[in-house]
Amino acid sequence: HGVAVDTIRAIDRDIATGVWPDMTEHGWERDEWPAISEQVLAADILVLATPIWLGEKSSVCTKVIERLYGNSHLLNEAGQYAYYGRVGGCIVTGNEDGAKHCAMNVLYSLQHLGYTIPPQADSAWLGEAGPGPSYLDEGSGGPENDFTNRNTTFLTWNLLHVARMLKDTGGIPAHGNQRSEWDAGCRLDFANPDYR
């Protein structure tokens, strides 16, 4: 369908902790985030995937979201936040409860940064509670799970549909949501209430 996919395993990358675009400017010796950030900003679709740990998304996923947030000062050509006009989703997997809670947190975080979240923008697979095989381990049943396969398919198509809609229409309309205009003193049809 003409979609190129890049996979970035954050756990395998040297991503510094912090909320600045480049943490080497703030005391860290190494930080691969600036290069990763370029890939993220070049993408129309971002899917964050996380295991469940103690009912929450992983600390690595939290770090990625914090680093995305570190770029929230960036603006697009229309003066909106840089993540406007892009779509986001998430995938959660693990052997304990909390998939919907994790998805709720990840999707909220993405929309707060400016991503558009389509309907059914999450998918999850949960193995048997307790220590056990992971999704791709032999005998896990993960790849054969109809519920997970259906939700992953719907997630994928909804991301593609909304990304295409945004691309074809030039993104989110640039009126009433331009940080550059607000900073310049425009109040974008938001009249100060007259208290009487």
What are the language-model segments listed below?
Residues 116, 134-139, 187:
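Short alpha-helix boundary/capping motifs
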